[in-house]
Amino acid sequence: MAGAPLIRLEDICKTFHNGDLAVEVLHGITLDIRAGEFVAIMGASGSGKSTLMNILGCLDTPTGGRYLLDGEDVSTLNADELATLRRRTFGFVFQSYNLIPTSTAQENVEVPAIYAGTPAAERRKRAAALLNALKLGDRLDHRPSQLSGGQQQRVSIARALMNGGRIILADEPTGALDSQSGEDVMELLRSMHQQGHTVIVITHAREVAERADRLIEIRDGQILSDTTKRDIHTPEATLQPHEEIAGNGAHIADISEAVKMALRALRANIFRTVLTLLGIIIGVSSVVTMLAIGTGAQNTILDRINAMGTDLILVRPAMAGFRGSGSIATLVPQDADAILELPNVKSAVPEVTGTVTLRRGNVDYQSQANGTVPAFSLSEIVESRQRQLHHPERYRYLRPCGWLGTTVVKTLFPDGSNPVGDYILIQKIPFQIIGTLEPKGAGFGGSDQDDVVVVPLSTGNLRLFGQKYVRSITVQVKDSSLIDTTQNQIQSLLDQRHKKRDTMITNMSSVREDAAAMGKTMTVFLGSVAAISLLVGGIGVMNIMLVSVTERTREIGVRMATGARRRDILLQFIIEALSVSAIGGAIGVILGLGAAALASWAGLSVGYSFGPVLLAFACAFATGLIFGFLPARKASRLLPAVALSSE
C-alpha cells in the first residue's frame, strides 16, 4: 500500500523495574499501521498487549526502539509535547469507561476540548451533538452512577471523538458489557472506521478481534502473527490532526473553568470539605478577632495617654541606685517656680500625694489626697465643676478645703446629696468641700482617677503629710514640637539648682511612643498565637489534598489521556486548595468580625481596620497556595499509564 504508515514501531522494548528486579515486557516489537485501518491486537492476560497500547497512545514511553507517529519520532518528545499529541490525535475508549464520577455525561465529553482551549459554548454544543448521535440526548445531565454500562461506554466513545479522535484506541471495549451492548459498541467502532478514523482495538477475545480487518496476535511480548482477513479499506478522506483554537492549546481555557472543576470536586465529598474548611475558618477568624482586640487595647491605652495630654512633662525625684523615689526630699515648690521661667513652659504644677482616711458620719474611707496649686486645672488632669469657687486665695494659706472625685462622692454621699459646702474629716481634720471633679474613669495602668480628693498644696504638705517637698511637678509646654528641648532645659536647670542629678524627667510624648510600641508588640503576639491555628488549618488542607490526589489518581490519568499537561493538573489541584482557603478565609473573616463585635458588645475595646482583615484573608490564600502546592505537584508528576491502572 502506497504512502508512509501513520504508526511505525521499530524494535520497541519495554522494561519495568521493581527494585533490583528488571522485567522486560515487550521484546523488539516492529509494526506498521496505516491511516484508516481497523486493527485488533489480541493476546492473553500478561501478553503485553496493554503495555503496547499505552505506548501506541503515548501514555507511556518505550525503554528502547523508535516510535514514529505520522513521521515524527515520539520518543524525543517531553511530557507536555506528548500531552499535546494525545489531545490532537488520540481518542481513548476504556474497558472500565474511566468517566469522572463528579461530572455529568456532557461534562465528561467536554474534558478533551477544555484542554484544547475550545470556547465553552462551542464545546457544549459539540458534546451535546455527539451524545445525541449516540442516542444519549436525554442523559446529558446524568452522572456516571446514573447510567448503565452500555451508556457509560457510549459516553466514553463520545469523549474519544470530542477532539476529532484521528486514532481511536479501544482497550477491551466490550469487556464489562453484556452481549447486546458489546455488539452495539463494536458497530460504533466499525462506523467510526468507515468515517475515516484509524481504529485499534485491544482485546483478549477472539470473537471481538475477528470483527477487525487486521488481527495482530501477541504473546509474551512478541508478535506471534499479523494477518489481514480482508482487503483493508482506507476512506478517501482520512482524518487530519485536530486543529486547536487556542494557539498551542493544551491549557485550561480560563481560570473560571478550573474553578468550576475544583468546586465540582469539592462538592463530591462535602463532609470532608467542611472539615477542611473548619481549620481555615478557625484560623482566620482567630487572627481577625485577636488583631481587633489587640488593636482596640492599644487604642484605649493611647487614648488615655492622649487624654492626659501629650504636651506634658513629668518631673519626679530620683537618684541613681536609690530605690523608692517617693522618699527623696529634694523636689520643692520653688523648683516649679524656676521651671515656669523657662521660655516654652506654659505652666508648672507641683503636687504632693498620699493615702488619707476620709470620714463623714459613720462612714470611713481610704482615698488618695492630691495637694496642688491653682494651675492644676491647666494640666488637664482634672477640672472643677464649680470654677467660681476655684480661687487662688484658697491655695496660698492653710485653708482646709478640697474637691472630691466622683468615686469619693458616691462613697461618702450615697444618698445623692450635693456635697458642695458640706464638711468631711480628712485625717481627723475638718475640710469644707468646695467642688467636685469631672469623672475621668480608669487611668493608665487601670487605677481609678476618680478616687481622689484635691486640696491646696500648702494644706496638703503641712496639715496632711507634714512635709515641705513635693512628689512631682507636672509641666505643660506651649509648643509640643519642642518638648524634648524643653525637657533637656528642665533637667539642666534642676541639676544646677540641686548641684547633682536627683530627678527623673519623662514626657508624655515618649510615654505614648513606648505604649504604642508595646501595644504593637502585644498585637503581633496575639496575631502570632492566632496564626498558629491558621498554620494547623493549612496542614489540614495539605493532608486532605494528598488524600484527594490518592483517591483521584485514575481521574488524573483520564485527564492526562485526554490531553491535560502537567501544568494543567498542577493548576487544577492548586486552585482546589485555593478554593478551600478562599471560601474558608471569607467565612473566617465574617465570623472573626462577628466575634469582635460580640467582644465589643461585652465591653472589650475593639479596633476595626481593613489591614488586619486583608492580612488574614491573604494569609489564608497563601496557606492554600503553599500547602496545596506539594499535593498538586505530586498529581502533576504522575505517569498517565500508571495513573490509569490504579485502583
UniProtKB/Swiss-Prot annotation:
One of its GO terms (molecular function) is ATP hydrolysis activity. PROSITE patterns: ABC_TRANSPORTER_1, ABC_TRANSPORTER_2, MACB. SUPFAM superfamilies: P-loop containing nucleoside triphosphate hydrolases (SSF52540). It holds the Pfam family MacB_PCD. It is found in: Cell inner membrane. InterPro entries: AAA+_ATPase (IPR003593), ABC3_permease_C (IPR003838), ABC_transporter-like_ATP-bd (IPR003439), ABC_transporter-like_CS (IPR017871), MacB-like_ATP-bd (IPR017911), MacB_PCD (IPR025857), Macrolide_Exporter_MacB (IPR050250), P-loop_NTPase (IPR027417). ATP binds at G43, A44, S45, G46, S47, G48, K49, S50. The keyword Cytoplasm does not apply. One of its GO terms (cellular component) is plasma membrane. Its main location: membrane. Keywords: Antibiotic resistance, ATP-binding, Cell inner membrane, Cell membrane, Membrane, Nucleotide-binding, Translocase, Transmembrane, Transmembrane helix, Transport. The keyword Signal does not apply. It comes from the Bacteria. Its EC number is 7.6.2.-. Residues 7-245 form the ABC transporter domain. The chain crosses the membrane at residues 274-294, 529-549, 573-593, 610-630. It is a multi-pass membrane protein. Belongs to the ABC transporter superfamily. Macrolide exporter (TC 3.A.1.122) family. Homodimer. Non-canonical ABC transporter that contains transmembrane domains (TMD), which form a pore in the inner membrane, and an ATP-binding domain (NBD), which is responsible for energy generation. Confers resistance against macrolides. This is Macrolide export ATP-binding/permease protein MacB. The gene is macB.
